[in-house]
Amino acid sequence: MFGAAIVSSSLAIATSICFLFFSTPHKSFYHSLFLSSTFSTNESISNHLYTLTKRPHIAGSAANAEAAAYVLSTLESYDIRSHVRPYYTALTYPVRRSLTLATTVRDPPIELRLEQEIYEDDPYADVADQVTPTFHAFAKSGTAVGLAVYVNYGRVEDYSVLREMGVNVSGRVALARYGKIYRGDIVQNGYAAGAIGVVIFTDRKDYGGDGKWFPDEKWMPPSGVQVGSVYSGAGDPTTPGWASTEECERITDEEVEKSGDVPLIPSLPVSWESGDVVMRSIGGMVANEDWQGGEGAPVYRVGPGPGVLNLTYEGKQVISTIENVIGIIEGVEEPDRYVILGNHRDAWTFGAADPNSGTACLLEVAERLQKLQKKGWKPRRTIILCNWDAEEYGLIGSTEWVEENRQMLASRVVAYLNVDVAVSGAGFEASATPQLDELIIQAATQVQDPDNSSQTIYDSWISSTNSSLVGRLGGGGSDYAAFVQHIGVPSADLAFGGGYPVYHSMYDDFTWMKKFGDPLFQRHTAVASLWGLVALKLADEEILPFNYLFYALELQKSVEDLQGDVSGRDIKLAPLFKSIEELKKAAIEINDKKKSLKGRKGWTWTRKDNQNLVRELNDRLMMTERAFTDGEGLPGRLWYKHLIYAPSKYNDYGSKSFPGIDDTIEKAKSLNTADSWHSVQHQIWRVARAITQASLCLRGELK
């Protein structure tokens, strides 16, 4: 009778078994259901992306407000309690810009094109005039006239090479190519070297392909320009450390400039077509081989001159309304514990990959969670879905929200799961704080690879890398920054594909995604599956699936890497090694405790004393990440509280473990004084103390 009633499908069998042995299905049943083909449709994700990218929607624009309304109405249609949280933030827009090149004193200056061309049969030609003119957000208004000097990627080490070559950058206009480091640091490094202005071009070697480009191939067209922010801080620069609410306190423009987070010289982004023109005007020594461009590019020389660049930029700063959309699915057993999923919505232009591939996935996750609720699922902990605004300007929407809710979030958030560019191509990538490594890897074994149905994401992931599977969240590249680096929340960032050629240009549209990024939208579906599964495990498992042993091993490796940097100096790393050993012991102890609880005979989660025991254990697991923060922040960078993960001082995209130690080592190498090396030792002690605090928290002990 039992068997005769359930012969229709394996899913029906699983459902019946669950209902036979449990009053309601086990949470793992719902997790499997979340991944089933009946719960997801590529078409739904495609429709969301198409709708979100119909018009350019830069932060502060009417089009972006319409996109926010679409996200809000979609979440509400899924019966998710949702609201908009507005902030009133300083954003900048271009008013006037020009770039001319004088090649000789006799010839008239060449006006370099700053516009991006509409391509043939462009379906978005009718709204192309709504694309904001190419610019750098928060660039300094002004004019710079000077001999052009080629500075490669504009890194600190590139300027060292130029000094060795005898090339003086002071009083010149630096020509740099995009790549390797954050554009804001390209400008800041140019200023530090004495440049009076910076022009950054999209080099065909890195972005332009081999003679074919979009719409025929995935590569950046000759007129394509990567726009973006050159602000080096996080959040509204006029409200450092507090939320940009209506009529709040703001610091002055002079104080913003003194912060060091906004450039003090003008800059402009240009295409590789314009970059070639400037490069042909530069003489002097031939640049090193690794500084050269790709096939078809002119020979790259360093200058200075004889070409003279005349750069003019005028921008306006306005207080604009930005809108975060927040959806809440309240937990049943622990409503005061939050699992947060976040993605930003604003785009420099159409934003098909960056960021609305992620927004489409967020809405897909929301829809599947609604379907689970209709099947009877209720999360143990509260799930919060966040759609951020003004990320592109400097992580503004997420930062303002975290700053406004700092104490609540610091005491209640279990984890933050970020997806920015969900899909830009093939190949899964993940970064996280180390206690989440095991969870992400485990989830990847349960989701089918979208490009090879015979294997899982984990199978393709592990075969495509020779290094660590999971990266780290030290860079300031997306909305996880406020959660990890400011308040110390365990976090992860997930994506398919790495960098892509049309990044931050007007060619990042639905057509590009449909032709090259994800033609069948299977990668989008896979991101939604993995993102949602990790969230479900964090929301539903009685004992949080954190493993701090991964953290201890990661820190040990980082200290070993430090040894070469302080070799030959009177620097003691013993405090670090000792504190990490204690963390390792604490991690093993709590892992053993989790196993013993799960394996105990007659264990039931409904007993009050067991609930209290598990709650206390979970609090230790949740709060240990907070222990890696320090209220004093990093040296000269108060907002960054995390002593393990934060951006490099000279590259916002990059990072090393122990950023405070790394910064002081670089300074000590430059000054080479006893005091500067003493500062290095002080930072080592600070980190060691933080790791010791983490061990005590994990053990739940008082000394």
Regions found by a protein language model. Name each.
Residues 151-219, 332, 336, 348, ...:
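A conserved hydrophobic secondary-structure block that centers on an alpha-helix together
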Residues 8-9, 24-31, 50-170, 180, ...:
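Noncatalytic luminal/extracellular "stalk/propeptide" segments of secretory-pathway proteins
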Residues 610, 614-703:
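C-terminal amphipathic alpha-helical interaction region
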Residues 325, 341-395, 400, 531:
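Alpha-helical metal-binding/catalytic segments enriched in His/Glu/Asp
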Residues 221-286, 334, 388-514, 520-521, ...:
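Metal-dependent peptidase/peptidase-like ectodomains
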Residues 126-161, 236-352, 367, 371-375:
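Soluble metallo-hydrolase cores and metallopeptidase-like ectodomains found primarily
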Residues 31-39, 53-62, 134-135, 139, ...:
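Second-shell loop/turn segments in exported
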Residues 384, 500-557, 669-703:
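His/Asp/Glu-rich mid-to-C-terminal helical/loop segments that flank catalytic regions of hydrolases
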